């Protein structure tokens, strides 16, 4: 299993880091089989798995539950878990309680937190306690209400300078990596060049140290529309619907189950049962 030291070395060597979300045992198993470097158990599970309109309703219990499943499916992959909305915008003691549970009960190797400001002290606090932290700047989904929706961040010089400053603060606080979401590719390159820790982009261009996408978006599974930055590499939901539709049709016409999918009893036993007739 790769560790934070390996990810730092990959940045230094210019080797891109791959990251993908997973939320359950089968998806984690497939992601590990595909040799993805790092798994993110994102609070995006609220939208793509649980059907919420945003990530806000996701709880610490949800994150623990899904992290456990992912760890069972991917025993040899570094797993980062999101701290959900309002689980770290509380007292440091409460933040540590939530963080400890996700790490100890869920099995996460690192935690991800969104934003800067007061979150910087949280990164420092958790890091000093021995919990690796991944920072997240740019479009931070837990704050879409304040940001005015899902919009590209850092498009003007002033806000771009603020993101650069915040990125440096995250690194200084001890973050082991930084996710940059929906920022101009030029800005992402500047930040990546100025930091010693790896940057993982999602909608941040190619001049970052790695990329992350949502599992369901990448394979087109249960999603109606995807963001501009998503490239869909396959469309499994079309195949799934096709297979289920064929099953329905075959059941309705009594084609399924054929003999090969059924069990039989010996003829003498059948005769002994009501003389081979139904009772």
Swiss-Prot record:
InterPro entries associated with the record: Pantoate_hydroxy_MeTrfase, Pyrv/PenolPyrv_kinase-like_dom, Pyrv_kinase-like_dom_sf
What's one GO BP annotation on this UniProt entry?
Answer: pantothenate biosynthetic process
Q: Pfam families annotated for this entry? A: Pantoate_transf (PF02548)
**Positions with a binding annotation for 3-methyl-2-oxobutanoate:** 43-44, 82, 112
Q: Where is the active site?
A: 181 (proton acceptor)
Cofactor(s) recorded for this entry are:
Mg(2+)
Recorded metabolic or biological pathway in which this protein acts: Cofactor biosynthesis; (R)-pantothenate biosynthesis; (R)-pantoate from 3-methyl-2-oxobutanoate: step 1/2
Q: Which reaction does it catalyse?
A: 3-methyl-2-oxobutanoate + (6R)-5,10-methylene-5,6,7,8-tetrahydrofolate + H2O = 2-dehydropantoate + (6S)-5,6,7,8-tetrahydrofolate
Binding residues annotated for Mg(2+), in chain numbering: 43, 82, 114
Can you provide one Gene Ontology molecular function annotated for this UniProt record? 3-methyl-2-oxobutanoate hydroxymethyltransferase activity
Subcellular location per UniProt equals: Cytoplasm
Annotated keywords: Cytoplasm, Magnesium, Metal-binding, Pantothenate biosynthesis, Transferase
Q: Which GO terms describe its cellular component?
A: cytoplasm
The record lists the membrane-crossing segments as none
Domain of life the protein comes from: Bacteria
State the family it belongs to: Belongs to the PanB family.
Instruction: Report the NCBIfam families cross-referenced here.
Output: panB, PRK00311.1
Oligomeric and partner information: Homodecamer; pentamer of dimers.
What role is this protein assigned?
A: Catalyzes the reversible reaction in which hydroxymethyl group from 5,10-methylenetetrahydrofolate is transferred onto alpha-ketoisovalerate to form ketopantoate.
Instruction: State what protein this is by name.
Output: 3-methyl-2-oxobutanoate hydroxymethyltransferase
Origin species = Bacillus cytotoxicus (strain DSM 22905 / CIP 110041 / 391-98 / NVH 391-98)
